[in-house]
Amino acid sequence: DLAVLRIGENVLFRGLGDCKFERANEAWKFDGGDGWTVAFSATWEQGRDWPTLAIGNFMDRETIIMDYGDCDASWLFRHNPGTGYQNPMALQPGHCTNSMLFSDWNRDGFADLRVSNDQEFYRRGSEQLFSLGPRGAVPMQAEDGWRTVNIWGMGIASNDITGDGYPDYYLTNMAANRFEVLAEGATGPSYEDRAGDFNI
């Protein structure tokens, strides 16, 4: 299957084999929206037969003047029997998203959603981590251990580079890229930039 992100309606295509696809928005009850979509991530959540999808939008197209505008909300789609991907949940606040990644950062068996944002365009924004639960997606705060980071966020990559059993994150940035490692002794999602220590 294939997800196509666009300025305008996003489209899901069902794979038919032999490099053939058919449009599936209507069959899967997926609202492709009309935003400026630049980011996508998908994961399998426990107890669900269909993948959970995150759609990341950049600026609200209706507010853009001279290349600047308000940051748009992004969306979390969970599939439910009978209703498909109807009734997506807003990921708010939106901070002009450029990249998303589902990741089980604390190895508890549940993926949360990291979001990398572009500080060139947001006001009072930052990088984000949304905790996923039955109520939707809740942004992590300082009281959860999440640290405020402001970058011209572009992309996110993840792997366990340090060998401690937890995923590390490489955040690309128009300035200095960040290599984020879970802080020693952290009980929440508290990360330190260790790019200098690893010469990257």
Give residue spans per PLM region:
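Acidic, glycine/proline-rich Ca2+-coordinating loop motifs
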Residues: 1-200
